[in-house]
């Protein structure tokens, strides 16, 4: 019995040393960024559209939801339950309600599968991560089904930064509305 215990201890000890001697043979390969982009309108596309850049969004982004940031685009109408543009907001384009507006982020549909609308209250301060937005009025170039005959809103988020960065923003407004944003990356 003692010989079996001794043999077991000897084998366990030998396996520990065998694992310690192995070297890592994995290579690290940095790949280029892959960006998923949905169909966007260009000057050659027969679609009425408006591009909103990051700079334009920054000028207006005080914590309100994206529909209020798009309120200055042609044919857009926004409403808010509380009146401040935060929380339950809606977007209408050319009179069409949110159930007929296709909204995508990096080409991925954001609309609810059942009601076909987007609940902006579930996306607080998403505008701080957006690179640009294209609003297409009318049927547009969307390939995401019947929900797009009113309009299409295509949001592209910021790409991967190869340089370390840090950013802190704070805003305060009426009705005790406030927004704090912290962004960093390595």
Annotate the PLM regions.
Residues 13-15:
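N-terminal signal peptide c-region/cleavage motif recognized by signal peptidases
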Residues 18-20:
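Boundary at the C-terminal end of the N-terminal hydrophobic targeting segment
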Residues 24-25:
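Coil residues (strongly favoring Ser/Thr
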Residues 31-61, 90, 133:
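N-terminal periplasmic "start-of-domain" segments of outer-membrane beta-barrel proteins
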Residues 66-69, 89-92, 104, 120-125, ...:
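N-terminal periplasmic accessory domains that precede
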Residues 67, 71-109, 131:
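Extracytoplasmic beta-strand/coil segments of soluble accessory domains associated
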Residues 83-85, 145, 173-176:
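Short sequence motifs at beta-strands and strand-loop junctions characteristic
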Residues 109-137:
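Short acidic/polar hinge/loop motifs at secondary-structure boundaries
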């Amino acid at each position: 019995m003692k010989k079996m215990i001794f043999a077991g201890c000897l084998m366990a000890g030998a396996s520990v040393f065998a694992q310690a001697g192995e070297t890592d043979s994995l290579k690290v390969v940095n790949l280029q960024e892959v960006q998923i982009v949905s169909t966007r309108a260009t000057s050659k596309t027969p679609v009425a559209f408006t591009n909103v850049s990051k700079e334009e969004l920054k000028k207006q982004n005080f914590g309100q939801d994206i529909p209020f940031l798009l309120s200055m685009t042609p044919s857009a109408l926004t409403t808010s339950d509380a009146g401040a543009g935060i929380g339950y907001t809606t977007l209408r384009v050319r009179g069409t309600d949110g159930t007929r507006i296709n909204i995508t982020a990096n080409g991925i549909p954001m609309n609810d599968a059942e009601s076909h609308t987007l609940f902006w209250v579930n996306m607080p301060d998403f505008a701080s991560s957006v690179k640009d937005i294209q609003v297409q009025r009318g049927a547009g170039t969307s390939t995401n089904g019947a929900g797009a005959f009113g309009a299409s809103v295509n949001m592209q988020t910021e790409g991967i930064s190869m340089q370390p960065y840090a950013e802190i923003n704070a805003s305060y407004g009426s009705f005790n509305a406030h927004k704090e944003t912290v962004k960093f990356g390595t």
